[in-house]
Structure formats: C-alpha cells, structure tokens
C-alpha cells in the first residue's frame, strides 16, 4: 500500500494556512483601529499606550488587544499641552465609595496644581474637566477607577505645578 504524499497537505494543513493568513491580516490591520472604532469600543482618541499597561491592575487584560490597537505612544506627542485649569467634580456624599479619589481630594496634593478646583456636585461620580484658556471645558474624563497616583500623574502632565 502506497503512502499518500498529500498527507501533510490535507485538510489540517489547509486550515493552518488559512488561520495563519487570517492572523497575519488581522495583526496588520488591527495594529491601529480608526478613531470611530475606538470610540465605539469605549476608548478615548487620546489614549496613551502606557494606560494599557495598567489594565492588569484592574483585572481587565481581555481589553489589552483593543487598547493597544487604539493607543498612541507618548513619543507621538511632540508638545506637551498644558491646560489653563481643571475642575475635579465629585459628590461629597459618594466620596467614600471612591477611596482613592477621596485620598487625593482630602490631601494637600490639589494645592500643588495651578488652576485646579475641587467642586462638590450632588450625585456626581468623580469627573475631571480640563479647561482651555477661555475657561471652557476642553476635555472631560471619568476618574472613577483611577488611583491617587494616577490622578496626580495625569494632572502633572496636564496642568502647571505651583
């Protein structure tokens, strides 16, 4: 009985070849999503890749591939944009539910940033509003799951220190 020469070229090989082609195409195309796709996935258009590194801290590693497809390397930002000010809004009665934000708000750290105001807004989850030179809201970010160091680091990048 003669051995079949196409044994290794059978259906399993075809499946492997198809899978390899699909993976190669996905990795080439998926390296960067459109800004619309990223918004639909819930990612900001100014997402930094260093933020994707933090997903493990919150047991969100399943989001890493999409995060990497939507993020921008820090080196892509030629100039560091500083905002004129910021408002950190939070409800005083809900502050206990967000101990990391509470620790930041009640510490001396807010005094280190020029133009940072803490506003207590009834019913509001922690939100950071960055203001342009005219005092208008340029960006608004939910900081629900941010830790104290993340808030301080972000503000260090976006506001002038006193």
Curated annotation (Swiss-Prot):
Forms a tight complex with UGGT1/UGCGL1. Interacts with UGGT2/UGCGL2. Interacts with RDH11. It holds the Pfam family Sep15_SelM. May be involved in redox reactions associated with the formation of disulfide bonds. May contribute to the quality control of protein folding in the endoplasmic reticulum. May regulate protein folding by enhancing the catalytic activity of UGGT1/UGCGL1 and UGGT2/UGCGL2. Belongs to the selenoprotein M/F family. GO terms for cellular component: endoplasmic reticulum lumen. This is Selenoprotein F. It comes from Bos taurus (Bovine). GO terms for molecular function: oxidoreductase activity. Residues 1-28 form the signal peptide. Keywords: Endoplasmic reticulum, Selenocysteine, Signal. It comes from the Eukaryota. It is found in: Endoplasmic reticulum lumen. InterPro entries: Sep15/SelM_sf, Sep15_SelM, Sep15_SelM_dom, Thioredoxin-like_sf.
């Amino acid at each position: 009985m003669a051995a079949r020469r196409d044994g290794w070229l059978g259906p399993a090989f075809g499946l492997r070849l198809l899978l390899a082609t699909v993976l190669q195409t996905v990795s080439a195309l998926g390296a960067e999503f459109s800004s619309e796709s990223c918004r639909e996935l819930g990612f900001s258009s100014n997402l930094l890749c260093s933020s994707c590194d933090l997903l493990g801290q919150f047991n969100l590693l399943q989001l890493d591939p999409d995060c990497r497809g939507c993020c921008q390397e820090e080196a892509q930002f030629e100039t560091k944009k500083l905002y004129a000010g910021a408002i950190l809004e939070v409800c005083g009665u809900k502050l206990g539910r967000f101990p990391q934000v509470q620790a930041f708000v009640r510490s001396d750290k807010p005094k280190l940033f020029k133009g940072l105001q803490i506003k207590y807004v009834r019913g509001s989850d922690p939100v950071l509003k960055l203001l342009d030179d005219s005092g208008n809201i340029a960006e608004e970010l939910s900081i629900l799951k941010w830790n104290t160091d993340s808030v301080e680091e972000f503000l260090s990048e976006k506001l002038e220190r006193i």
